[in-house]
């Protein structure tokens, strides 16, 4: 009861009063006090207005135009995203180190159904997008504890080495192959290893993935890491058909190099077909451009030239043949041809030293023959000509 009486004694707020009550609160006279009107009169006195109108009767008063609000500065366009460049190019030279570090790959053919195949002659791995690529790590002796394995991709050609290898914009934005662990711009991923670390170097801007080195199992002699390549080699805005190298390094816990090896990678739709094509091109190139010793070709030329006329030298062992020819013109034609052949053989040295004597003896033996046969042959041709 006491609380209810206290609530009744509280005056209502101002908003609950009537308009008449509010009106009565205003003063009865001098709604606008002189204190407020005085400053208004000082702003523009009457005498000043009259003088101003007398001086400029034909001009209308011009009010000062309100200053236009300052236009906001034009928005600068966002800078185009350019590929980061790195002045540091990692070495790709093979370095087995003290532990005999080297790489190995599973043997696979060139069938169309393969998703990953390695060519030993090209030292090149052909694989499909986001498919498993097992890479074997071989060592002669176990490395120290805390050893890590780093994988990094660089461009193979010299003019592209300073550019950082990354995925194309389309695959970066795509969520089809997102695992939530690897950054979308990284090209190389490790499959089935939650201890993988994806690093972006602040100085070189290059991407790499690092996993702890694990010793081989009891029934195995090597350690296998399954890599994925998350962008095609032909993607525009990414690799753009530029060949790349994957560098695998063995490092200790402080980052010191223990071993290095590398191989070329091509991410394509049909690895078996591309491997077969490139191996055939390499084979044709090797056949068309052999690399023999510098003097071997010079020695081969005279042996070929001397061996080629040997079959023609056998019938010229001093044996002569007689050919009956009808007509003097035909005889002269064959004689000139025979003399030319004899001269050619003499110049080439295909006959023994007495070849000239034999050729002169042959000419003296064959020349009188047409005189004795000329008359009867002319007599035979006489009736035919008539």
From Swiss-Prot:
Region Interaction with WWOX: start-end pairs: 63-102
Cofactors named for this entry: Zn(2+)
UniProt cofactor note: Binds 1 zinc ion per subunit.
Positions of region (Required for interaction with FBXO42): 105-229
Residues bearing the modification N6,N6-dimethyllysine: 363, 366, 375
Positions that bind Zn(2+): 168, 171, 231, 235
Keyword vocabulary terms for this entry: Acetylation, Activator, Apoptosis, Biological rhythms, Cell cycle, Cytoplasm, Cytoskeleton, DNA-binding, Endoplasmic reticulum, Isopeptide bond, Metal-binding, Methylation, Mitochondrion, Necrosis, Nucleus, Phosphoprotein, Repressor, Transcription, Transcription regulation, Tumor suppressor, Ubl conjugation, Zinc
Residue segments, region Interaction with DNA: 266-273
Protein's UniProt name: Cellular tumor antigen p53
């Amino acid at each position: 009861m006491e609380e209810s009486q206290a609530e009744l004694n509280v005056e209502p707020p101002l908003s609950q009063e009537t308009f008449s009550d509010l009106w009565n609160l205003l003063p009865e006279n001098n709604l606008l006090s002189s204190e407020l009107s005085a400053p208004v009169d000082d702003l523009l006195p009457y005498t000043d207005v009259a003088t101003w109108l007398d001086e400029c009767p034909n001009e209308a008063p011009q009010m000062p135009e309100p200053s236009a609000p300052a236009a906001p500065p034009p928005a600068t366009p966002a800078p185009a995203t350019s590929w980061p460049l790195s002045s540091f190019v990692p070495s790709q030279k093979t370095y087995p180190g003290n532990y005999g570090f080297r790489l190995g790959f599973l043997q696979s053919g060139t069938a169309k159904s393969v998703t990953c195949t390695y060519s030993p002659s090209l030292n090149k791995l052909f694989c499909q997008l986001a498919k498993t690529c097992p890479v074997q790590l071989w060592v002669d002796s176990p490395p120290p504890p805390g050893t890590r394995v780093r994988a990094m991709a660089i461009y193979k050609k010299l003019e592209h080495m300073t550019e950082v290898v990354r995925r194309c914009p389309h695959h970066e934005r795509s969520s089809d192959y997102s695992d939530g662990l690897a950054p979308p711009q990284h090209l190389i991923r490790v499959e089935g290893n939650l201890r993988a670390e994806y690093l972006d170097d602040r100085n070189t801007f290059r991407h790499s993935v690092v996993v702890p080195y694990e010793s081989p199992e009891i029934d195995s002699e090597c350690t296998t890491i399954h890599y994925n390549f998350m962008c095609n080699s032909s993607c525009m805005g990414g690799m753009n058909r530029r060949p790349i190298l994957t560098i695998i390094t063995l490092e200790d816990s402080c980052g010191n190099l223990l071993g290095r090896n590398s191989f070329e990678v091509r991410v394509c739709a049909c690895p078996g077909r591309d491997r077969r094509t490139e191996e055939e091109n390499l084979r044709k190139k090797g056949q068309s451009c052999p690399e023999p010793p510098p003097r071997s070709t010079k020695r081969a030329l005279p042996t070929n030239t001397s061996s080629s006329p040997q079959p023609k030298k056998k019938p010229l062992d001093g044996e002569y043949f007689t050919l009956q020819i009808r007509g003097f013109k035909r005889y002269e034609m064959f004689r000139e041809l025979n003399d030319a052949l004899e001269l050619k053989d003499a110049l080439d040295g295909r006959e023994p030293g007495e070849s000239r004597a034999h050729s002169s003896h042959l000419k003296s033996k064959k020349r009188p023959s047409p005189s004795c046969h000329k008359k009867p042959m002319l007599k035979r041709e006489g009736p035919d000509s008539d």
